[in-house]
Amino acid sequence: MTHETPPPSYNDVMLQMFHDHSVFLHQENLSPRTINSTSSSEIKNVRRRGTFIILACLIISVILCLILILHIFNVRYGGTKP
């Protein structure tokens, strides 16, 4: 009589993946000296670039919404009247 082990559950697989990922992250050379060697100007540049991208997307979205609203208003109320 042989006992077969049941396949691992979904939770077991996810926990193992999370554990493996955590171990991988901690194996990288992330000593405090390495983290502090990143200059504050580099961090500011990354933040500034991210902020610029977000603002650009918001401005484009607002412009497209205004164009859509004006188009709907023009179609509904600005049609040629006899």
UniProtKB/Swiss-Prot annotation:
The chain crosses the membrane at residues 52-72. One of its GO terms (cellular component) is membrane. It is found in: Membrane. It comes from the Viruses. It is a single-pass membrane protein. Keywords: Membrane, Transmembrane, Transmembrane helix. A motif (PPXY motif) lies at residues 7-10. Coiled coil: none annotated. Interacts with host ITCH; this interaction probably mediates ITCH degradation. Interacts probably with NEDD4. Down-regulates of the TCR/CD3E complex and the transferrin receptor TFRC in host T-cells by blocking them from recycling back to the cell surface. Late-budding domains (L domains) are short sequence motifs essential for viral particle budding. They recruit proteins of the host ESCRT machinery (Endosomal Sorting Complex Required for Transport) or ESCRT-associated proteins. Contains one L domain: a PPXY motif which is involved in the interaction with Itch, a member of the Nedd4 family. This is U24 protein. It comes from Human herpesvirus 7 (strain JI) (HHV-7). The lineage of its organism: Viruses, Duplodnaviria, Heunggongvirae, Peploviricota, Herviviricetes. The gene is U24.
